[in-house]
């Protein structure tokens, strides 16, 4: 999240993370960076490398999407890098045969997470967040009276077989106050 401190209406001030239940977990990687590479042909996977020595690819699953590849259309360069916090992957195949993937929720504080703690109400699929959970890049608490910008990134680097990559699905953001 970001407060427009300089008042220019642009997201060019300091970004803050909203801490969640796994922020301080031993398995959480702070200062994580992953770089994605534009595929050179339609139907090809999106390759990635990270700053932990890892690499892999986002599989192209034509049965679920009809775009040429999963590299974002709004990115004009052949690579783009995301920086932030990486959570431990919790997904697993309960069948042992690759046919029944489970993605358990995190305790609280993450988008597209079905924790009862995060829900706006008992019947909603919406998640709620509090800017009182804002932290800086070093994990220190930050007091923000309000925010002007929201950026949402998937905090997990994992695949779930035929479901594909674990990714955040967000349909909108609104103020609950």
Name the predicted role of every residue range.
Residues 2-7, 15, 21-24, 150:
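Internal, well-ordered interaction modules that form the hydrophobic cores of assembly/scaffold domains
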Residues 152-159:
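Short beta-strand-plus-loop segments that form exposed binding edges in beta-rich domains
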Residues 121-141:
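A Trp-anchored, charged/polar loop motif used as the substrate-binding/catalytic surface
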